[in-house]
Each structure stands twice: as structure tokens, then as C-alpha cells.
A protein has these predicted regions:
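Aromatic-anchored segments of alpha-helical transmembrane domains
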Residues: 18-29, 70-80, 168-175
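Alpha-helical membrane segments and adjacent membrane-interface helices in multi-pass membrane proteins
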Residues: 1-52
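Membrane-interfacial segments
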Residues: 27, 31, 53-58, 84-93, ...
Length: 184
């Protein structure tokens, strides 16, 4: 999130998602093939949205809001995918046999728990500390100018929202195909 707010959000988002895929899935031997595309796309969308929201990286309030919104977007998309898998009978819900409606409560609680604990401890606090301190200091080391409010990558618009929705649709389709066992 920090790099998405300081540099080009799309490049940082793709790098963050690739790093998470390599270091938390492939190196640990937990790579799930097509199923990993859902996580890759939702992480990319979450970091990209957070990076686009920040126009002035010195504004602590906006940095904090963007960090929570980006994290919430990623977690919410994952929650929707999990609910859709149960509701469309692609995957069984083991918690309460015969009661697929209970997935709403279970996934909703998991979303709130992840957002309140992981979102604050591992996203909000480090981002609030790092972004204002690194802004204007790290960019010259890389031969770049610091982002300003006039930067073309600052702000959300309809085009960004449409691309994010299309990316999420691809994530849902990939996870549904992976969960149903459809070979490619």
C-alpha cells in the first residue's frame, strides 16, 4: 500500500500481488493454479484503489482512509467470491449442513475480523507511519518526481471503477472454474 501511494499505483499493485503470490503461495508449496488468480486480482485491485485515492501523500487522514478502503475492498471481494461459491453450489459449506445461508454470517464475521485486526495492524499503522516519512525522500533516489495532486494517477474516476469491476468479474470466474475442477 505504501508504494502504491508513493509511486504509480498500477505498477505497485501488480508488484505487491506478484510478491504475495510468489512468497506466500509458491515458496510455501501452496500454489493452487487457477485459483490463485482470484487472490492476485483482488490484491491488485485493492492496492490500486488505495493508491489512486491518495492525491497528497502528506495528508495523514487521506492516507489512513485509503489504507482502510484498499484493505476493505480486497477483503470484501474475497468474501463475495466465497459466498458466491456456496450460493451457486460450486463448493459445499461445511459449517452447517443444509444451511447455505449461514455462509453470510460466517464470511461477514471473517471479513470484519480480518479488517479490524489485520487491516489495522498490518496495513493502516505501517502505512500511516511510512507514507508521510518517505514522501519526497525515496522518489529522487529512483530518479522520479514526487506525486502531486496534479499527477495523472491521482484520483478515482468512472474508467478506473469499470476496470476494477471487470477485474473482479475475472477473479470470480477464475475462482468458480478452479473450485468446480474445470481443467483449462
Amino acid at each position: 500500500l505504501t508504494l502504491g501511494m508513493l509511486f504509480d499505483p498500477l505498477s505497485a499493485a501488480l508488484g505487491a500481488a506478484t510478491g504475495e503470490l510468489v512468497f506466500s503461495e509458491i515458496m510455501l508449496g501452496q500454489f493452487g493454479g487457477l485459483g490463485e488468480l482470484e487472490k492476485f486480482l483482488t490484491v491488485t485491485i485493492g492496492v490500486y484503489i488505495a493508491g489512486r485515492m491518495v492525491k497528497n501523500p502528506k495528508n495523514h487522514v487521506m492516507v489512513g482512509v485509503a489504507a482502510l478502503v484498499g484493505t476493505a475492498a480486497q477483503l470484501f471481494m474475497g468474501m463475495l467470491v466465497d459466498i458466491a461459491k456456496v450460493q451457486f453450489a460450486v463448493e459445499d459449506f461445511e459449517a452447517v449442513a443444509g444451511l447455505p445461508e449461514s455462509v453470510f454470517a460466517t464470511e461477514g464475521f471473517a471479513f470484519a475480523n480480518d479488517l479490524l485486526f489485520s487491516g489495522i495492524l498490518f496495513c493502516l499503522l505501517p502505512t500511516l507511519y511510512l507514507v508521510p516519512r518517505l514522501y519526497g525522500k525515496i522518489e529522487p533516489l529512483l530518479g522520479m518526481a514526487p506525486r502531486t495532486a496534479e499527477s495523472p494517477v491521482a484520483g478515482l474516476n468512472a474508467k478506473v471503477c469499470i476496470v476494477c469491476v471487470l477485474g473482479f468479474a475475472c477473479a470470480v470466474a477464475a475462482e468458480m472454474l478452479a473450485s468446480s475442477g474445470t481443467p483449462l
